[in-house]
Amino acid sequence: MAKRSIFRFADEKGLKVAARYGVLMSTSFIFALLFHSSVADVNTLWSPGPESAFDAAETYYTLVAGSHFIVKYTVYTIMGLNMIFHLIQATGAKGDDKLFFYSSTLLYLTALILFIVNVAPSMLVVKLQNYVQFPRNMHLSVLAASHVLVEFLLAGVILIQLGYVFGYHVQSIQQREYAEDMREQELAEKAKLESESATTQSVETVSTESVSKRK
């Protein structure tokens, strides 16, 4: 019995394909969110501007940290789903797939830990304006640097996933071409055998007729 379309990802291979696209989409979403903070980070880390630049960055992160709880839970849910997708990919990986899936999982796990341990608490400190460990300007610069590190790790995840997809498609094309070549060879050999068989039968028929005429 054929599977219905809604259950086309029910088998192991289909589940891993769905997880691969889930990793790509969720990682790209998180990367885009963090990259948006560059509007504030560029003037606090890469080219530190006047005091007004740090005031603007503080206002920006205060607004981000004070986002509606639905927005926060949505982002955290996507982060959690990304980890689940990675685990689905890595489970039962064999051969060269281990290198791709384990590396991607390690990079994302590192980025997730860095975000939970450093980025999220730092934004909360900005919201509360409770600068204890560092002065305000230094704190904002460290927060910007943490954002950059997380973005680099997520970019690595995206590149690994895209590299695997590219390699998978190239391998599929090569396997399809190899299968077509083998099919053509089999057809050629079959035609050759049929031709030889027909020639043999023709020779035997001629020989039989010659013997009959002699008799």
UniProtKB/Swiss-Prot annotation:
Membrane topology: Multi-pass membrane protein
InterPro entries associated with the record: Psh3/Shr3
The keyword NADP is assigned to this record: no
Ranges facing Cytoplasmic side: 1-21, 89-105, 169-215
Extracellular side: 43-67, 127-147
Molecular functions per Gene Ontology: protein folding chaperone; unfolded protein binding
Keyword annotations from UniProtKB, A to Z: Endoplasmic reticulum, Membrane, Protein transport, Translocation, Transmembrane, Transmembrane helix, Transport
Stretches the record annotates as Disordered: 190-215
Spans through the membrane: 22-42, 68-88, 106-126, 148-168
GO terms (BP aspect): endoplasmic reticulum to Golgi vesicle-mediated transport; protein insertion into ER membrane; protein transport
One Pfam family it belongs to: SHR3_chaperone
Cellular compartments per GO CC: endoplasmic reticulum; endoplasmic reticulum membrane
Domain of life the protein comes from: Eukaryota
Compositional bias annotation for Low complexity: 196-215
Location of this chain's protein in the cell: Endoplasmic reticulum membrane
Family per record: To yeast SHR3.
The protein's assembly and partners: Monomer.
UniProt function note: Involved in amino acid permease processing and required for the efficient translocation of structurally related amino acid permeases from the endoplasmic reticulum to the plasma membrane.
Protein name: Secretory component protein psh3
Source organism: Schizosaccharomyces pombe (strain 972 / ATCC 24843) (Fission yeast)
